Amino acid sequence: DWSWSRGLGDVYKRQIAGLPQAAVLILLHETSEDLNVIYCLRSNNLPTHAGEVAFPGGKREEKDETLKETALREAQEEVNLELKDVEVLGEISSVQSRFGLSVTPYIGILKSNTLIADGKEIAEVFSVPLNFIKNNMQKEQKSENWDNKKVFFPFFEFENKMVWGLTAYMTVEFLKLLDIEIDLTRK
């Protein structure tokens, strides 16, 4: 049962109307062993989020009629996604980034995993088995000061790559759709 209307945690319940918009694509690829979530390692040469793990995506441009188009366009640019290779299932609730963007995640099924990092914005494309995420999402969250509050974020590490912050939070929200609950209460 894909329920796209689940709410987000209190940290992210903010008015996001009027903010600049962005969209990301949470791509899933099924193998014989597991369902895998596709992540990107951003290039170290970028002015923001350098070397961080993210989903393919970015800011909405004037030419994008919808946020879904934004997510798909960015995935084409960053990881050479062929539109024929993805089926977009829908979106989950938008979240506000700490930089004042309203980010809308879209969920897509990747029919063939032939993604290639563009080498400019994205250094590497990698997939993480869903069961690994489920079993390794940390319960002691990393904290940061955000709007003068200490905020606790979910995170997990995979092959020396840290998935944290908004990317990990959107991952947890996606897992909720699959009725996989991650205990994020602070210990």
Label the model's feature ranges.
Residues D1-Y12:
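Single conserved hydrophobic/aromatic residue that forms the stacking wall/gate
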